Regions:
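Short amphipathic alpha-helical segments
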Residues: 17-18, 133-135
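Short acidic capping loops at alpha-helix termini that bridge into adjacent secondary structure
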Residues: 36-39, 140-144, 172-176
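Conserved Lys-Pro-Asp/Glu-containing loop-to-beta segment of HAD-superfamily phosphomonoesterases
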Residues: 154-176
Length: 176
């Protein structure tokens, strides 16, 4: 084993309050939408189908905008501000300050790096992964990063993994 790749969202980082029920209420209010925060968990579950990758695995921002729109709709949000609200949610997802690193991430990356393993990131995000590494001080550990928004295809399309393997200079059987 020469390399280990990590996903970013919900593997290395988790969203803060901005992307919880009250955060979505605030998004809605800024766009003239009233939402019921009690419906947030069910809304996220219902909206999750919008994120499923179909046969066309190309990265399309609209998939994520639809997710935000659906969450707001499932929370009762209706009105002309819905589209702008969904787009703001999408844009804000890229802001590193809205996320926290899981507390075991740095120690784990440090240990793996010390063992001589190459570490990489593969993410279906539009967040700049260089900015992500800088914000969370991960540059010393990460040897390469590929996001679907810049590479063009979302996981599990083979090409995003091939791009990541190439970036680290390893073969598939040398990586996890």
């Amino acid at each position: 084993m020469k390399a280990i790749f990590f996903d970013v969202d919900f593997t290395l980082i988790h969203p803060g309050p901005r992307f919880a029920a009250e955060g979505y209420r605030s998004f809605g209010e800024r766009h003239g939408l009233s939402v019921d925060t009690e419906r947030f968990d069910a809304a996220v579950m219902a909206a999750s189908q919008e994120l499923e990758v179909d046969d066309d695995a190309r990265y399309r921002p609209e998939r994520f905008v639809r997710f935000g729109r659906r969450v707001i709709e499932e929370m009762g949000g209706r009105g002309p501000g819905l589209e702008a609200c969904a787009r703001e949610i999408y844009e804000e997802w890229a802001v590193c300050e809205h996320f926290s690193l899981y507390e075991d991430v740095k120690p784990a990356l440090r240990r793996l790096h010390a063992r001589g393993l190459l570490l990489g990131l593969i993410s279906n995000t539009h967040r700049c992964l260089d900015a992500f590494q800088s914000h969370f001080a991960l540059h010393p550990f990460i040897s390469g990063a590929v996001s679907s928004s810049t590479q063009g295809f979302m996981k599990p399309h083979p090409s995003i993994f091939e791009t990541a393997l190439s970036a680290l200079g390893v073969a598939a059987d040398e990586a996890m």
